[in-house]
Amino acid sequence: MSSPPLPDAKPSPMAGVELADQLAVLQAELAAIKTETAVKVASLEDTIANLAHENTLLKRRLYGNRTERSHTSELQLALGDLLAGEAELQRALDGAVGKVEDAVEPESKPAGSRPAPKGRRDLSLSKLPRVVIEILHEELEASGCRRIGFEDSSQLMFRRGGFAVLVKRVAKYEVIHDDEATVETVPSPETLFPRALLHSSAIAHVITSKFALGVPHYRLEQDLANQGAQLDRGTMSRYVEHAGNVLGATIVHAMWQDALTNAQVISTDATGALIQPAKTKDGRPQACKKGHFFTAVVDCDAILFAYTEAHTSAFVKDLFGSFRGYLQADASNVYDVLEHGPPKDSEDGVRLVGCFAHLRRYMFEAAICRYPVGLQGLLRIRAIYAADRVVQRAPAAGRTTLRDQYVRPLVDDFFAWVHATKQITAGRNLATKALGYAANQEVELRRVLETGELPLDNTRAERALRKIVVGRKAWMFYGSDTHAEAAAAIFSIIASCRLHTLDPFQYLEEILRVLPYWTRDRYLELSPKYWRATRGRLRAEELATPISAFEVPPPLGEVAAVSASASPSS
């Protein structure tokens, strides 16, 4: 049985409209999905590019040159095509630097300055003690031949001085008074370490071995045992902590007060270090915590260190809050409280100065990852450094004017380029990071133009922190917060001794004997900056005797003038 024929299907007008609406909705959804997918793909591509750049930087830190200097051959291999495109910019910058070199006459060297040594060192100019060995011909000497001279040659030799036992013999006298005999003992000279096992010279040796040479106590313990001096590391740690705390509360404290009161430029930076906390109540050791060391390079007068448990704005305010001058630091926000704190009655305060070396690192990383922006910024910063190096060769009195005349145009051109390039550089990558750092730090970076005494960067503070970093690798951690504070004081003394070309061992050995006799208001006279003048006014026989009382001379005129200018009444 056949089915009846179906009626002709005629689409209604309403069905066509519904299909058109559904098609439009589907097309809109498809467009949205495509847009979302494109955004995700672009984001993933940016992530892949950033990870590739991070991998490039990590490989460079592992296998490349650890310094920030790049030799011409290295740049040509890595950035050959980019360098070719920036040839015109390089020529323009070279021309600007050439104008400075033509205009600036270098400062003449003082009369009597020795030329730079060439070839092998001439040991005949050394002030070291001499051991003369004559090599003779026994047969010719016995036969009566006339000796007509010697052929002299010199070598640097070493003789171990070693330890010795210092015996202090205090005389006792029988005194007869009113037919009665009494025993009278000569008063012993004052000392920082009464009834101590170690003399000040041994303490100075332990301190300089660890904090000047980076020898941890366990290695020093082995070396002392080889020399016949049995001294355990616990004893050494106790003496070092005692000496460091005394120096920190006296000489280093006076140096900090002098720096905050009289310095014009302070360069500062900070680094971390591990601190061993105390054991729990049940005697279990705890994991090390992190502390922080701040350094302050004070003009050309001192290098100081301070320890804190936390890297915070509160500590920075306590440390530098009373300073009135230029404070050069990195872009860490802990320093902002010094300049952007609550308004004060006086406009005089800390003026933060930026660091072109930090900016250069951001540009360098962008250039290594083949961003043209990074290379252009690097070339411009190099021109600023080259022009400023020429300015620094001029007499100090005219450096500010020369820097304003020749370096300022390069700095103005650099920041004009930064703002223009930042507007057309999209994304979140190393290029935008470098440009953002430059734009955010423009005010602080421009402050180097205010005076010729300001360096372009903060690298001298970073160099001062190297001893902390080397120690961090050598002895891993500090025993307590108190020991870290003592270490900061010792680092301050040793770094300042290096700055003023003093032997840290001799300085510490003599200071630890002189300090008990010095008055509190004159501790600055014992700082490395003034020690040569102070030492020259002490009696030589008192300094030469291992145990001696000291006659304190009148105040040093130069230090007295500094102290008077720092007093509240001035």
What is the meaning of each model-derived region?
Residues 149, 183-186, 275-277, 304-306, ...:
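Short helix/loop capping segments that flank catalytic or ligand/cofactor-binding pockets
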